[in-house]
Regions:
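Extreme N-terminal segment that seeds HTH/winged-HTH DNA-binding domains in transcriptional regulators
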Residues: 1-31, 37, 85, 89, ...
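Short, cationic-aromatic polyanion-contact patches
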Residues: 10, 34, 68-85
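Short alpha-helical segments used as structural interaction elements across diverse proteins
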Residues: 13-15, 48-51, 62-63, 80, ...
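Beta-hairpin "wing" of winged helix-turn-helix
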Residues: 25-26, 30, 58-67, 71-74
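N-terminal helix-turn-helix
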Residues: 31-63
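Residue cluster at the C-terminal edge of the helix-turn-helix DNA-binding motif
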Residues: 41, 58-61, 76, 101, ...
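Short amphipathic alpha-helical interaction patches enriched in hydrophobic/aromatic residues
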Residues: 76, 94-95
């Protein structure tokens, strides 16, 4: 994973875990890699993964069972709520960017309605829209 130098690494790992849950890469109830294994995979210190896991647990998206491991929550309602919030933020940023270019809300709506859809390969489309 490439990291953005302007954002703490643990925050980027939290976002990756959230996105993997939202796009189904990590299934409900699935066991996450151990802190040590995830640190090796992500090429970071174990303390960074530990913090990311703890923050994910605080967000309610994973649960840790002492001596067993960390697991994706099985609360579909919460996952749906997080997905809706993610979509809202993407749309809000999209509108903000177009307004910064001088488009009105009505013009933005017309652009969305009249822009031909871009076809992405299925495997890429889920990843691109959850970043």
């Amino acid at each position: 994973m490439k990291y953005d130098a302007d954002i703490p690494i643990y925050v980027q790992i939290i976002e990756k875990i959230k996105n993997d849950i939202l796009n189904g890469t990590l299934a409900q109830g699935e066991k996450l890699p151990s802190i040590q294994d995830m640190a090796v995979t992500m090429e970071v210190n174990q303390n960074t993964i530990s913090r990311a896991y703890k923050d994910c647990e605080s967000l309610g998206i994973i649960e840790t069972k002492r001596g067993i491991g960390s697991f994706v929550i099985e609360d579909q309602a919460l996952i749906d709520q997080l997905r809706t919030e993610k979509v809202r933020l993407i749309i809000q940023a999209f509108i903000h960017d177009l307004e910064a270019l001088g488009y009105s809300r009505d013009q933005i709506i017309d652009l969305v309605k009249n822009t031909p859809h871009i076809q992405l390969p299925v495997a890429e489309s889920a990843k691109e829209f959850t970043r």
